[in-house]
């Protein structure tokens, strides 16, 4: 079984939902960079204090800090398998992450790209009822995603580890498709 995984996909594709299901089903550790950052800040670790200073200014935490936090978590207890969600977001981050993981002998084994058409994504995001989920904002987020993520798709495809998943259908169907693609269905 592939036990070092990364999820990619546009906003509304169901990455978080599918990551949670797969981790529960396979006993993987779900590494959400947002959750890891918040945990470091709450623990007031040196990395957390540095991240808090940046976050309190409304700025993005540097790639170096995020990579350090990911590395710390991986070396702690993620040897048995993990799924990384929410990072990387651009090609430089992907290349840095790949180097880091190779250095600790934990290279990514599969990158799951959940694909959906824009209209389905927009419908899903609008149904969440969040105040910032207007059609205009959602379309802009999709544009930004495509601009930043297209190079990641090519990068991981060139490494031979990209697996495309059709995200249409209900949660259980997509989960089954993912497990099947990873060879987890008998």
Curated annotation (Swiss-Prot):
Keyword annotations for this protein, in alphabetical order, are: ATP-binding, Cytoplasm, Kinase, Nucleotide biosynthesis, Nucleotide-binding, Transferase
According to the record, the residues making up region (NMP) are 32-61
Q: What class of enzyme is it?
A: transferase
Task: Name the PROSITE patterns on file.
Answer: ADENYLATE_KINASE (PS00113)
Localization: Cytoplasm
Q: Which GO terms describe its molecular function?
A: adenylate kinase activity; ATP binding
Look up the record and give one Gene Ontology term from the biological process aspect: AMP salvage
Q: Which domain of life is it from?
A: Bacteria
Per its UniProt record, what Gene3D superfamilies does this chain match?
Answer: P-loop containing nucleotide triphosphate hydrolases
The secretion signal range is none
Q: Which reaction does it catalyse?
A: AMP + ATP = 2 ADP
Q: Which residues bind ATP?
A: 12-17, 128, 169
Residue positions annotated to bind AMP are 33, 38, 59-61, 86-89, 93, 130, 141
Look up the coiled coil feature and give its residue ranges.
none
- Specify where the region named LID lies, as residue ranges: 127-133
Cross-referenced CDD domains, in alphabetical order? ADK
Alphabetized Pfam families for the sequence: ADK
Which Enzyme Commission number(s) are on file for it? 2.7.4.3
GO cellular component entries: cytoplasm
Family, similarity comment? Belongs to the adenylate kinase family.
What NCBIfam families does the entry give? PRK00279.1-3, PRK14527.1, PRK14531.1, PRK14532.1
| Domains as described in the record | Consists of three domains, a large central CORE domain and two small peripheral domains, NMPbind and LID, which undergo movements during catalysis. The LID domain closes over the site of phosphoryl transfer upon ATP binding. Assembling and dissambling the active center during each catalytic cycle provides an effective means to prevent ATP hydrolysis.
Q: What does this protein do?
A: Catalyzes the reversible transfer of the terminal phosphate group between ATP and AMP. Plays an important role in cellular energy homeostasis and in adenine nucleotide metabolism.
What name appears for this protein in its UniProt entry?
Answer: Adenylate kinase
- Origin organism is Prochlorococcus marinus (strain MIT 9211)
Q: Which gene encodes it?
A: adk
